[in-house]
């Protein structure tokens, strides 16, 4: 009986330690203040070699930043060279706000990116838009850094 109690105590300690270690925080690569726009690379993937797949937005905004416009120019260049490739722009928001508000904001963000691609000669017929609002966060923490990573538009190759 004492042996089982010792094993149970050790198991509880081990599980508690494991759970606490899973709660470590991420480094603030891009600032991450409430109104900041995340520009770090830890959540960025690539549409093609050297062409980032996502752009980030300020809180409650669908306006493109200088960094976002630069990324979208590179995407447009890649798309001009790959004329058979179609893309989907996924609009996202952070967890704050209602589901409906965030779906609308995600759509505005994706459409801002689409409009910018179109100014660089990409046909709107090649670009689809979908909004996930706050439904698909890349970082589920409730922190300014997580929110800034989730305020994004992601460009993916259409299937």
Features from the language model and the residues they span:
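A generic structural micro-feature
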Residues: 145-149
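Surface-exposed aromatic
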Residues: 93-98
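Short beta-alpha junctions and helix-cap segments that line functional grooves
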Residues: 140-143
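Bacterial N-terminal signal peptides that target proteins for export
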Residues: 2-11
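Periplasmic peptidoglycan-binding/tethering modules of Gram-negative envelope proteins
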Residues: 24-86
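Extracytoplasmic/secreted proteins, especially bacterial periplasmic and envelope-associated proteins
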Residues: 67-74, 100, 108, 112, ...
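A non-catalytic structural micro-motif
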Residues: 84-92, 107-138, 151-159
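C-terminal motif of bacterial Sec signal peptides marking the signal peptidase cleavage site
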Residues: 18-22
